[in-house]
Amino acid sequence: MENICELFDDVILEIMNLLSDTDKINFMFCCSRFYYFIDLVYYNDIYDYYKIQNVSFINKFKKIRYLAVTDTIPSVITHLELDKSFVGSLENCQLPKLSCLKLTQLQYDSFKIYISPAVKIDILKLPTYLKYIDLDYSWDIETYSNSNNVIVKRLRTDFICPVENREGPKCGLMKTSCISTNYYSANYYQYINSQQTQLVTGKHHVPNIQTNKSVKQPIKYSSNTKSTINNIFTNILNNIPKNIPKYTPNNIPKIVPKNTHYRNSSKKYRY
């Protein structure tokens, strides 16, 4: 046989199913004869749901990945990851094709009775080092510690006293501060080690070391700038090393210079 197009359909289909997904597509675009099989072959790579949701032959994709923020989850999903801020429950989710599930330990503890034993579970682990510093809208500093220390997911501060010069390292007064974690448990709040405390409350810029994401612009505190920690975390405050100054919202006025000009913490002052 001189022309492969003259093969029977089932033979061509069998050949295509032996190819990688990329080769299948390239093969189909050779001519209209092969393009006919686009909705007949199976695709074996993992695809994001939002990229193929409007494809009429979505059932031909063997692995479909989806990041769920709510419990409205498509039934065709095979690889599911629950967002750390996931809202809802897996109780009423119909996921007959689900084979892999990635979630946090707390989420697993909450939903494990609704998870089929056949589903492969991947529980997210907390890293044991400073992961990255996000200097976007919220000025979040995300840190992590090992199991012997407090698990600080996010130190959130409001920047209300920007300097006149918007260029260079940012400095000013950090108005409020609160610690939260997606892995929350009262037992986690034990103490912050000296290295973490220095990263959070030090006078100098946060060093870009042991990170997997470069710092666009380091935060540099002025001599009158202190990071304040909400007094509801008294058990943390009591264990901060003595050489690290501790300030609560009640005594902030004592450290604010009299000539300080307060401005609205709008977006334009955060850049």
UniProtKB/Swiss-Prot annotation:
Residues 260-271 have a biased composition (Basic residues). Residues 251-271 are annotated as: Disordered. Pfam families: F-box. Residues 4-49 form the F-box domain. InterPro entries: F-box_dom. This is Putative F-box protein L165.
